[in-house]
């Protein structure tokens, strides 16, 4: 199981949003590159980077900063935010990003999402963000009217390489993960699942680890918890390694 430390970029700073709301942000660092290096030093095996400016504007905003992050760490980077065409996808892959996270267009433009999966096999994943069980789009602003199980068969057929499932109700709230919902999804999904939203303490790591052993759960993303100290990334990675050695 992989714990993905998150670096969310807004206005050139590393921030966290509460339940994805642009007006409810906490700035954790004025230097996202230093933060990326820090999480690698703490034992991170992957880095989860989101261009929040891009997510809200629909176009890449922090491309040069992201290129610098990729060049500054030796661990792979997965990136989301504002990637809504193949040209942008290619540019980020050329900049050193290992794999890309597609959100809105996976739901609103299935043909384009399928084309991206075909063009960059194994490197395109999807982020599905749910509130009250319903998928949201465009930076969690619009309700798609769909559930995750409405779209899962198509995403599987199109070749999505991984699936990030965010529980908006719990994101940034440090209220713990929804183990039941994640377990069901990891069992039903042929696509590796990554949990996001609510990962707050070692107890969440303990709760998710058995799911990763018995079902298709690849890991979990954590942000606010590792910045504020309720979860120690190095401790979490040591614990996981001790179970899988």
Swiss-Prot record:
Pathway: Amino-acid biosynthesis; L-histidine biosynthesis; L-histidine from 5-phospho-alpha-D-ribose 1-diphosphate: step 4/9
GO biological process: L-histidine biosynthetic process; L-tryptophan biosynthetic process
Keywords: Amino-acid biosynthesis, Cytoplasm, Histidine biosynthesis, Isomerase
Active-site residue numbers: 8 (proton acceptor), 129 (proton donor)
Example of a GO cellular component annotation carried by this entry: cytoplasm
Annotated compartments: Cytoplasm
Domain of life assignment: Bacteria
Catalytic activity annotation: 1-(5-phospho-beta-D-ribosyl)-5-[(5-phospho-beta-D-ribosylamino)methylideneamino]imidazole-4-carboxamide = 5-[(5-phospho-1-deoxy-D-ribulos-1-ylimino)methylamino]-1-(5-phospho-beta-D-ribosyl)imidazole-4-carboxamide
EC code: 5.3.1.16
GO molecular function: 1-(5-phosphoribosyl)-5-[(5-phosphoribosylamino)methylideneamino]imidazole-4-carboxamide isomerase activity
Family statement: Belongs to the HisA/HisF family.
PANTHER family assigned: 1-(5-PHOSPHORIBOSYL)-5-[(5-PHOSPHORIBOSYLAMINO)METHYLIDENEAMINO] IMIDAZOLE-4-CARBOXAMIDE ISOMERASE
Name of the protein: 1-(5-phosphoribosyl)-5-[(5-phosphoribosylamino)methylideneamino] imidazole-4-carboxamide isomerase
Organism field: Oleidesulfovibrio alaskensis (strain ATCC BAA-1058 / DSM 17464 / G20) (Desulfovibrio alaskensis)
Gene: hisA
């Amino acid at each position: 199981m992989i714990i993905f430390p998150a670096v969310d970029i807004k206005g050139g700073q590393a921030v966290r949003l509460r339940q994805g709301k642009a007006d409810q942000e906490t700035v954790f660092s004025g230097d996202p590159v230093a933060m990326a290096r820090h999480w690698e030093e703490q034992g991170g095996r992957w880095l989860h980077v989101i261009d929040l400016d891009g997510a809200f504007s629909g176009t890449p905003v922090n491309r040069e900063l992201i290129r610098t992050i990729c060049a500054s760490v030796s661990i792979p980077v997965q990136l989301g935010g504002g990637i809504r065409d193949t040209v942008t996808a290619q540019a980020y892959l050329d900049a050193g990003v290992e794999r890309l996270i597609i959100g809105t267009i996976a739901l609103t433009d299935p043909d384009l999402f399928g084309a991206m999966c075909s063009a960059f096999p194994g490197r395109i994943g999807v982020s599905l963000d749910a509130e009250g069980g319903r998928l949201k789009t465009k930076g969690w602003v619009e309700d798609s009217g769909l559930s995750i199980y409405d779209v899962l068969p198509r995403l599987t057929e199109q070749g999505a390489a991984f699936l990030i499932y965010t529980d908006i109700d719990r994101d940034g709230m440090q209220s713990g993960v929804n183990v039941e919902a994640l377990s069901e999804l990891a069992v039903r999904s042929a696509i590796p699942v990554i949990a996001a939203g609510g990962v707050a303490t070692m107890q969440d790591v303990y709760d998710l680890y058995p799911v990763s052993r018995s079902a298709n759960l690849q890991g979990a993303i954590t942000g606010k918890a590792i910045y504020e100290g309720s979860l120690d990334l190095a401790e979490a990675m040591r614990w996981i390694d001790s179970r899988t050695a």
